[in-house]
């Protein structure tokens, strides 16, 4: 693989990070011709099929999350507002980002043009950032409710709404700059989906500073909030457990909480660590060659989160799962288990906290 082309000959709307045997790079524009010089047609078809799978799974799961919360009163707790917010952000990514990518991969180039690329890049980044910050808010809200660092503070609906609004404000702050000249939205990887420009340097777009901004503001800070909040939550629950008799119910609840926390943190890392690692590697290894197809993997991981985040935060919750089954099967669960978090798990304080707060319900 040849090193990337010099940054002195940059088109305004795209950049292909590899040397290409073409006298006029514009003739290979990802907005004009199939990008089969970057990968085989089979690879593009496979990516289109994967994006279609994300759409087919993500739309029903996230739509059901919203509909079930509206339909069942017991799901409309203040701590669940952020899950509806997460579902809305996921739907934005799916309906704009994944759908556009699916069509583009099927055509093997970004057939919708530069303006659509900017719209798709902005919308997908906005939805992704809102989703990312929603995971941090989920963790922090549970820290406030369970650990009670503010004493007798009561978590109200207004606080939940404020948390949701904050995610959209922070998401806009992170995703809007490329629309105004701080970095830019261009086709990435196989040139069939759009995102911030990680590839170029020493130019008018100042991409290096934008990448560092995203790394700090949209990965480091949320990750610190998540690790701190869930770490304190585990410490608090262990302290509660030590004050009680170590019954089988308490031990089971403790294991469930620990497992849920680990899954939540890993879900965040699986979603965003590849994107962050790739962007930082490109910024700090200018001139180093890399497989262009691999540059599509981080985007795939982030778009996949629209499916596995609802699985972690919604389907792993008994109350949400029970309500979804009732909705789908006309009011009765096919398994005959009217799961309710107010059952035997409330035999001890720690088990009650684990089921109704850590796994949001």
UniProtKB/Swiss-Prot annotation:
One GO biological process term: visual perception
Glycosylation sites: 24
GO MF annotation terms: G protein-coupled photoreceptor activity
Tissue distribution: The color pigments are found in the cone photoreceptor cells.
Region (Disordered): 338-361
Residues where N6-(retinylidene)lysine is found: 303
GO cellular component: photoreceptor outer segment; plasma membrane
CDD domains noted in UniProt: 7tmA_SWS2_opsin
Membrane topology (Extracellular): 1-43, 107-120, 184-209, 284-291
Location in or out of the cell: Membrane
InterPro entries per UniProt: GPCR_opsins (IPR050125), GPCR_Rhodpsn (IPR000276), GPCR_Rhodpsn_7TM (IPR017452), Opsin (IPR001760), Opsin_blue (IPR001521), Retinal_BS (IPR027430)
UniProt PTM: Phosphorylated on some or all of the serine and threonine residues present in the C-terminal region.
Segments forming a coiled coil: none
Pfam families in the cross-refs: 7tm_1
Composition skew (Low complexity), residue ranges: 342-361
Topology in the lipid bilayer: Multi-pass membrane protein
Keywords for the protein's UniProt record, in alphabetical order: Chromophore, Disulfide bond, G-protein coupled receptor, Glycoprotein, Membrane, Phosphoprotein, Photoreceptor protein, Receptor, Retinal protein, Sensory transduction, Transducer, Transmembrane, Transmembrane helix, Vision
Cystine residue pairs: 117-194
Cytoplasmic topological domain residue ranges: 69-80, 141-159, 238-259, 317-361
Role: Visual pigments are the light-absorbing molecules that mediate vision. They consist of an apoprotein, opsin, covalently linked to cis-retinal.
Homology family: Belongs to the G-protein coupled receptor 1 family. Opsin subfamily.
Protein name (record): Blue-sensitive opsin
Taxonomic lineage of the native organism: Eukaryota, Metazoa, Chordata, Craniata, Vertebrata
């Amino acid at each position: 693989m040849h090193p990337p082309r010099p940054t002195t000959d940059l088109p305004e709307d795209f950049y292909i990070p590899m040397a290409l045997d073409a006298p006029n790079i514009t003739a290979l524009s990802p907005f004009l011709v199939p990008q089969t010089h970057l990968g085989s047609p089979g690879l593009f078809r496979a990516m289109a099929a994967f994006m279609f799978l994300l759409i087919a799974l993500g739309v029903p799961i996230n739509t059901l999350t919203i509909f079930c919360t509206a339909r069942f009163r017991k799901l409309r707790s203040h701590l669940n507002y952020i899950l509806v917010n997460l579902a809305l952000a996921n739907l934005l990514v799916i309906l704009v980002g994944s759908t556009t990518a699916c069509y583009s991969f099927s055509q093997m180039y970004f057939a919708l043009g530069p303006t659509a690329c900017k719209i798709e890049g902005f919308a997908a980044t906005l939805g992704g950032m809102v989703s990312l910050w929603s995971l941090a808010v989920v963790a922090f809200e549970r820290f406030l409710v369970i650990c009670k660092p503010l004493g007798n503070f009561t978590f109200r609906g207004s606080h939940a709404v404020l948390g949701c609004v904050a995610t959209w404000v922070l998401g806009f702050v992170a995703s809007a700059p490329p629309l105004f000249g701080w970095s830019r939205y261009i086709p990435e990887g196989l040139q069939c989906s759009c995102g911030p420009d990680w590839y170029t340097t020493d130019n008018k777009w100042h991409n290096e500073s934008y990448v560092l901004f995203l790394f700090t503001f949209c990965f480091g800070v949320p990750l610190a909030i998540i690790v701190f909040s869930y770490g304190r939550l585990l410490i608090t629950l262990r302290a509660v457990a030590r004050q009680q008799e170590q019954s089988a119910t308490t031990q089971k609840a403790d294991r469930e909480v620990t497992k849920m926390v680990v899954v939540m943190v890993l879900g965040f890392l699986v979603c965003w660590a590849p994107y962050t690692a790739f962007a930082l590697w490109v910024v700090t290894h200018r001139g180093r060659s890399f497989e262009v197809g691999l540059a599509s993997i981080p985007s795939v991981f982030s778009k996949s989160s629209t499916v596995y985040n609802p699985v972690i935060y919604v389907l792993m919750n008994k109350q949400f799962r029970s309500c979804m089954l009732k909705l789908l099967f006309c009011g009765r669960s096919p398994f005959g288990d009217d799961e309710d978090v107010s059952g035997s798990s409330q035999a001890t304080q720690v088990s009650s906290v684990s089921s109704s707060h850590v796994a949001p319900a």
